[in-house]
Amino acid sequence: MIVKSPENSYDIVIAGGGMVGATFAISLSKALKKAGLKILVVEAFEPSTVDPNAASFDSRSTALSFGSKEILNDSSIWVELSNKAEPIREIVISDKGRFGTARITCKEQNLEALGYVVENKDLGLILNNRLTRSESIHYFTPATIRDAAPRKSGMNLKISNGSDSHLVRSNLLVLADGGKSPICDQLGIVRARQNYNQHAIVCNVAFEKAHRGMAFERFTETGPLAVLPLRNFKNENRCSVVWSVNEQESDKFLKLNQEALLRELQGQFGQRLGRIKKLGEPHCFPLGLSIAKEQIRPSIVLLGNVAHTLHPVAGQGMNLALRDMEALVKSIEKGIKEGSNCGEMRVLQRYLENQSADQHQVITFTDNLVKLFSSNSMSKVMTRKLGLLSLELFPGLKKSFAKQAMGIGWGG
């Protein structure tokens, strides 16, 4: 429920009420309902006033793996989201201008879908409504945590909304406020960063032909190009595009008029879904790898982009964050049963030990994929050809790759 001012003390304070922070709060509240944990979510932006029935051609979207769907189902979020999600029934992986195409289908995997694409506004409204209605979660917005200082068995927090400040004690502070978390900087938590010298051009398009639940990962000379299926909008065959290009080319492409940019995109993607009939407003953001050197401290844990920001090439950022979130909920749940404070290091250390292999594999896989498919050197071109061919020739290898893509194979 929305509160006008926070109480003096909470078991858990979550900085950030976005997709990761809100989902964590809802999942934790459901899993530990009997424990009666006091949870506070602090969100800098006011709840959206967007009409839930209003549609937009340009709505941003997120790809959720099959494993993420299961996590959201356990949190009773999926029951509200399922009728707004577009299923991915087939993934087509190709290298522009070279032989070798790999296809992964839900039929091969005996599943109804490999994953789902949801519009951020739909998921955001569901999460916001759940936070607003929840009796076990205090939702303080718009507000920010201005200062965080360790104390014995917890944290002292200074939370501001407008000209008012509130002092709050918390056993555990969860930082889920994005890759530019000011509290991380204030606490001196350092991030290792790697610049890929690429920008992502993100937009929605309408194709001549229906996508039929197909998602495409196309590796081009400009960089990886992902095309994801979206729900139709006014009888338009919509897809979401994430096109990774080098920094210099991104400036060039964004200066083009819409017709010229559409031609460039059509040339890179080809005619798999016919011609592109409409191009939405493009947005651009820099791509890199960022990993926090400390994900836990006594009474502090990092989740989502504040812990690790990945390249979108494999679509694993949000999915990894949800698996981290699920593991943290389980560790806190076990700790409480053992009589531990939820911010104790043994609780947080157990979480990190359980998730470290998953994180390492996803980060390494994504980083290697970027380097392999963003290079036109002959050795890497041959490696790509062999890789795509091997996925088709060896069913066991394809099944293993599919499990990773569906978010059910990481971490052993």
What are these regions (language model features)?
Residues 294-312:
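Short FAD-binding loop at a beta-strand-to-alpha-helix junction that anchors the flavin cofactor
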Residues 84-186, 194-199:
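Conserved N-terminal helical subregion
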Residues 29-57:
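Glycine-rich FAD pyrophosphate-binding loop
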Residues 221-285:
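Conserved FAD/dinucleotide-binding core of flavoprotein oxidoreductases
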Residues 330-412:
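C-terminal helical "tail/cap" subdomain of flavin- and related membrane-associated enzymes
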Residues 67, 180-215, 245-249:
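Central beta-strand plus flanking loop segment that forms part of the substrate or channel wall
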Residues 54-96:
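N-terminal FAD cofactor-binding segment of flavoenzymes
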Residues 4-20, 40:
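Beta1/beta-strand and adjacent pyrophosphate-binding region of the FAD-binding site
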